[in-house]
Amino acid sequence: MGLPEYEADSEALLSQLTIEFTPGMTVSSLLAQVTTNDFHSAIEFFAAEKAVDIEGVHYNAYMQQIRKNPSLLRISVVAYAFHVSDMVAETMSYDVYEFLYKHYALFISNLVTRTLRFKELLLFCKQQFLEKMQASIVWAPELEQYLQVEGDAVAQGVSQLLYKMVTWVPTFVRGAVDWSVDAILVSFRKHFEKMVQEYVPMAHRVCSWLSQLWDKIVQWISQASETMGWFLDGCRDLMTWGIATLATCSALSLVEKLLVAMGFLVEPFGLSGIFLRTGVVAAACYNYGTNSKGFAEMMALLSLAANCVSTVIVGGFFPGEKDNAQSSPVILLEGLAGQMQNFCETTLVSVGKTCTAVNAISTCCGNLKALAGRILGMLRDFIWKTLGFETRFLADASLLFGEDVDGWLKAISDLRDQFIAKSYCSQDEMMQILVLLEKGRQMRKSGLSKGGISPAIINLILKGINDLEQLNRSCSVQGVRGVRKMPFTIFFQGKSRTGKSLLMSQVTKDFQDHYGLGGETVYSRNPCDQYWSGYRRQPFVLMDDFAAVVTEPSAEAQMINLISSAPYPLNMAGLEEKGICFDSQFVFVSTNFLEVSPEAKVRDDEAFKNRRHVIVQVSNDPAKAYDAANFASNQIYTILAWKDGRYNTVCVIEDYDELVAYLLTRSQQHAEEQEKNLANMMKSATFESHFKSLVEVLELGSMISAGFDIIRPEKLPSEAKEKRVLYSIPYNGEYCNALIDDNYNVTCWFGECVGNPEQLSKYSEKMLLGAYEFLLCSESLNVVIQAHLKEMVCPHHYDKELNFIGKIGETYYHNQMVSNIGSMQKWHRAILFGIGVLLGKEKEKTWYQVQVANVKQALYDMYTKEIRDWPMPIKVTCGIVLAAIGGSAFWKVFQQLVGSGNGPVLMGVAAGAFSAEPQSRKPNRFDMQQYRYNNVPLKRRVWADAQMSLDQSSVAIMSKCRANLVFGGTNLQIVMVPGRRFLACKHFFTHIKTKLRVEIVMDGRRYYHQFDPANIYDIPDSELVLYSHPSLEDVSHSCWDLFCWDPDKELPSVFGADFLSCKYNKFGGFYEAQYADIKVRTKKECLTIQSGNYVNKVSRYLEYEAPTIPEDCGSLVIAHIGGKHKIVGVHVAGIQGKIGCASLLPPLEPIAQAQGAEEYFDFLPAEENVSSGVAMVAGLKQGVYIPLPTKTALVETPSEWHLDTPCDKVPSILVPTDPRIPAQHEGYDPAKSGVSKYSQPMSALDPELLGEVANDVLELWHDCAVDWDDFGEVSLEEALNGCEGVEYMERIPLATSEGFPHILSRNGKEKGKRRFVQGDDCVVSLIPGTTVAKAYEELEASAHRFVPALVGIECPKDEKLPMRKVFDKPKTRCFTILPMEYNLVVRRKFLNFVRFIMANRHRLSCQVGINPYSMEWSRLAARMKEKGNDVLCCDYSSFDGLLSKQVMDVIASMINELCGGEDQLKNARRNLLMACCSRLAICKNTVWRVECGIPSGFPMTVIVNSIFNEILIRYHYKKLMREQQAPELMVQSFDKLIGLVTYGDDNLISVNAVVTPYFDGKKLKQSLAQGGVTITDGKDKTSLELPFRRLEECDFLKRTFVQRSSTIWDAPEDKASLWSQLHYVNCNNCEKEVAYLTNVVNVLRELYMHSPREATEFRRKVLKKVSWITSGDLPTLAQLQEFYEYQRQQGGADNNDTCDLLTSVDLLGPPLSFEKEAMHGCKVSEEIVTKNLAYYDFKRKGEDEVVFLFNTLYPQSSLPDGCHSVTWSQGSGRGGLPTQSWMSYNISRKDSNINKIIRTAVSSKKRVIFCARDNMVPVNIVALLCAVRNKLMPTAVSNATLVKVMENAKAFKFLPEEFNFAFSDV
């Protein structure tokens, strides 16, 4: 090592000076060496600016700053000398230049980082001097300013604790001779607890909780080794170092986090980082001398690894303010790869090797193992360059991890097992075989080219390739017939010489690369060849110059059968290829022709055109020259699609790479569609062998062997001369020969081969595969035997007579199998034995286990010996990499610790200790822990009980605005402010740094709240802070006037006031209200408020003489100002126990109410009927009236229409005056009783467990959202009108109520939302200037700032209820009408999320959108049955009122986490959701405050309830499992063990038998009851039990489960619901007969699902008993059957339109139009024409025109003169025409308003225009009838026209009867 070139005397001085360290040396002896003048001179020499950097030591900017400061440099050198003296185990002597330039510089440069800068160095120095000299270093202010750091204020005890831990751990690890992980961790735990007890006794109880962690760390080592499997058996040392390093580092970070939360540490300073960069590095240096080869490089590498670990671990526990570090093994490995990239670039370039950049590594590596493999490869190259030796372990590891050889071997083993179980390979399995084969060949090539790979690994790969090739040969010629996926077909079409063939070949190559397939996976098909010679189920089939020549059959005709999902046997030339079926996955075609040839003999051109999934029309760009090296450079690709009878251009692509991306995307979409289409068929499909009998197999063998000398007859026994050879295969050193005749008689013997071994081997393979295929696909083999094929094909289980001598399972199980085994025929056993020998099946071992066992010991011996000689730094670095990929158990616990926040365990210790001068009691560090374990409800006395002679106004203010905030033993007074905010004392709340679960106690109610310190807003020049959160209960906005917001204007200098406080009496257990008369002075001078280190100064305050006591802070000062009592100040401090000080109210901004609704309310002085969830707060002002339904719309039908069916349902009670109300329930009010369901919300849930459950659900959402990229808000137009053609984006219902307060402006005939929109009924928009439009704009502008004040109307639901809910105990359900603008904004923010949930119902629990008529019901049943036969069918009590704000806040966070977006959008989502849980409800003339539940009129009610339902079940599942100490793996396996589906409050829970001892109905019922949730049996609501039921006994959505076949389940509706439809009909929008007929059709359809026989009998009864219904009015059974067949092909929700389309006779005719131009409109007569608004702008009408707008939403007041808006109700079965009554009144009647306007216009020489949107047929008919009625058209013309109409559509058959005037002159 060279030295700086300085004066010779200085260099000589340094070379002679040494420093010596001995074990156990005293501090004085060390100081004697480092305090000499010579040593100080050496330090000055080291600090000289001209000094040259020594090789291997990097002097960063921070290091240079240390060298420039003599004091810091000397102190740090001495501190390092102290540190080294602790680490030596034997006497060591260093030259001073070596000590300074190498050891000290290396250590300090690692200690000083860019992130923490000098903090660790200063702490390190403090610790060393504190430990060795009991002296505390105080850094001078100028030094701190020079280093730009803040002084640390760490207690001595904590400093010593941390120092002891840092120095002890590596020392102990270094001294552990046997490297026992258990010994290291056990000792570490004991030492840790000892240090805590000695130095920080107050923290001992926290550490006792932490000590539970060490019990698990030992398990992580074993689990990691098991995870990595056979390969790491020989490198346990490496895994020990890796896991121990990560685990201890995490433990220390957790300790530090706890100490910070407890207030022992002011801020974190990276204890784990110090441990890694000092302890681990020092321990790794032991016995690795400084003169060793590569010492500097090794230590730099280890430091690099330590820095990466520290970044991940510290970043997990202490994330940055802006960048939240993602702590995971992926981040660790990516960081390590990036650091090694920079580190290795210079060291490896000399040998011609460079490391891949980290971004390239991340791109190329598809998984964690691949990334680790790349890193180990770099490490291998580094060792070769640095130390000069080759390591086979790293060479093997880089290959095994980089290529995931272990996963490759397991996949091969799985494929072989599947082949044994089925005797064939499916389409997907064949694809997997080819992918694995190509990967194996690539690994073989890579291993041989790189060198250094162990022979055992190479042989293992070769064995896998050989067995894959055998499996490929076996499966590629199979003829098993079954369902297959339709191939994805691409047609490259274009003119000749455009490069189509080249393009097709290149696309094929890119597809092969994408799927990892080799070049032999393509079959080039010549349509002229009648045979498919050489076809081996290749994934790709190419057809070049398709249809270029005429063939028979034609090329187009051949495509019909190829591009299908039906099995298609091919015509093969070779006998051995007989029966192969086509099942390639891709068919690529190049052709010059776009259309089908007339000579193709294809009867349906559409069938051919629909089989071309993508048409790529290839052309050349004339502006670009052809480039032979890049033929695609001048190509243009036009993507065509055949749709609606023509070719449509989808897009035009000019770049080849974009084309490939497009084709791959379409390919993936096609595959997903096929999987969905065939999912059920794949499960239930039976596959047929093309061999009808075993004789056919034997005949095939005879034909194969004909002409070849395969078998030598002389070697056959005499009795077997007439038999055929089945096989002759080698086994255990001899051959097993099996012969069989046509009667299946078998002769077997062991001996020599009976023919040519090589040829006979191929012959035997084909015969065995054919025979095995026939055996498994036939019914000959017992199904019990087929279920145990893995054991039955094992040759070790047979003796030489082929008798089965093995054992299946345990003895008791095997005994049950004996009869089945005995029933097997000998030819069965011969085939099973032979296939087992052929496939190398070994006893009780998979193929994977056999192969691994063959190499395991050899690798263990080799790796153990090699790793033993590695330098320790390499061991530690490599161990960290292995732990990152193998330590899954550690990482799981680590993520749980990181993700838990500070948790409730830390909540009570968050505040810290401070002075008692401000009169708030200091938070107790253990308050939250005490609360957590002693959660006993506190008794209290309400304020009205206190003996007070105070003015009632002051009491009312206290009741509305004062509250207490409670956590643990801390009880604070706060002031509630409108807008979900409160004011509180700054000196207390500034010390709360972590989230807390607190309780808010107000007058008459209390609730829990998750306090988040991030929502505290500092108020300058005030001792108050403002806290705001959406989940706080709001106080009435009328309370705003109860505060004095402008003290300068309103307050005099001296005034009288009331001092009011309400503190908790600990001894009495109640809140005690007190008051005092005070004289208040307004002070305008500085007041200093101190609390320990806390100091705050305010320039203005209120002062009064009052003997205030502790905990008075937060008390109210109320004065009579401006004619009313107001809060003028909040008590914040006291002076010497005599003078009180209050802070003036800050100038807050009021939060506007979007609805401005409270102007209609008269608020009560105090709330009434108070409960946990609701309270009556006001009444409606005089004259304010809310119109609600008072009479039912349900009409009872005549008795003969009841069809002798029972009915126990009647219309519900809507008004208190209903005479049906029983006498004992007199006074029952349905509107007010409806709000009572919100009176008792559920109890608060444990936030940690709730967060864990939310993360589980959120993870499922993210899994479903991989391909879902649209979660943004939709436009207002889309929120109103929906999106045409987009699933689950329907328009907003306009017929429903507009909500409060807009409902108050209704006129007599107006109703619903229609009056606030305008448009043509297809596309509408808000009418500007209306109350809804204004409220919408206000809500949009403010939703992100605060929770809107929501007012709903509770409206009794007009429905049929059981008689007991009317006559016995009235119980009418209510639904909530919410304001229109609120619903619109919610739809904008959440519509895409709702679409996502509904579209993924097949994967999620929420089943909103399910179609019970489709196969969805069958899939739901299969999903339940998959978990087992134990199903809980549950029913909640008052579910609508259970949801708490705590859970709603969590749901809002989940949705925001999934949907993302800007902060403004996230805040708006949260506020809109939270408004539901804290709103006002109008119940007739009273107003109630509701603080829980979901209003039924909320657009997302059913979605949110479904999510809440799922959270409840998941929460109590984990709670119950952990309470019973179930294995954690089961706790975390909800989705594996439980099948859950929800739909609002409806659910089904299928429970796996494994967890029934822990989780059943009884335990679930009890657990829910503890939280205030009542759940009962859904089938028997009176039962006290919640038993398991079979799925067939359960119901869901009032539908049961009836299994029709192995795959089809029906969902018949409860008959009681059906019969009630015959007794009562809703006549709101139609005549009674029409409504009844609609119900009859629905009942008929539902009865068909019960059974076709019942439907037939019901149909006949209807026709017999209801005389006016004809057979043509009812669908036939054939139509019903077709309806269900159609529905089972659908995936979307059912709707009435679909039902009408398939069951209504009137709609089965062809569509009607007068002419092709009729859809644009037509000329009816000279005076009357019709126009389609899609093509005509009525606003541009002429002065000589009169316009009628039919069924649009344009208000009449907004239309120009001469325009008239007409709306009708469509009649059922009338082809779109209005009801009979409407037509009679408006068309047939001559003096109707419409006819008058027409006649007036005609007399004025004006033209009349009838306008509508899209469907013009009804308007055309109305126009024609109007023309003939007003004598503008001859009757002969109208007669002929209408007759033609009726011929085309049966729906209009009623026209002659109703409009006789149009058919004859009357």
Curated annotation (Swiss-Prot):
Keywords: ATP-binding, Covalent protein-RNA linkage, Helicase, Host cytoplasm, Host endoplasmic reticulum, Host membrane, Hydrolase, Membrane, Nucleotide-binding, Nucleotidyltransferase, Phosphoprotein, Protease, RNA-directed RNA polymerase, Thiol protease, Transferase, Transmembrane, Transmembrane helix, Viral RNA replication. The keyword Nucleotide-binding applies. Residues 945-1150 form the Peptidase C3 domain. InterPro entries: DNA/RNA_pol_sf, Helic/Pol/Pept_Calicivir-typ, Helicase_SF3_ssDNA/RNA_vir, Helicase_SF3_ssRNA_vir, PCV_3C_PRO, Peptidase_C3A/C3B_picornavir, Peptidase_S1_PA, Peptidase_S1_PA_chymotrypsin. The modification O-(5'-phospho-RNA)-serine is found at residue 920. Pfam families: Peptidase_C3 (PF00548), RdRP_1 (PF00680), RNA_helicase (PF00910). Coiled coil: none annotated. This is RNA1 polyprotein. It comes from Cowpea mosaic virus (strain SB) (CPMV).
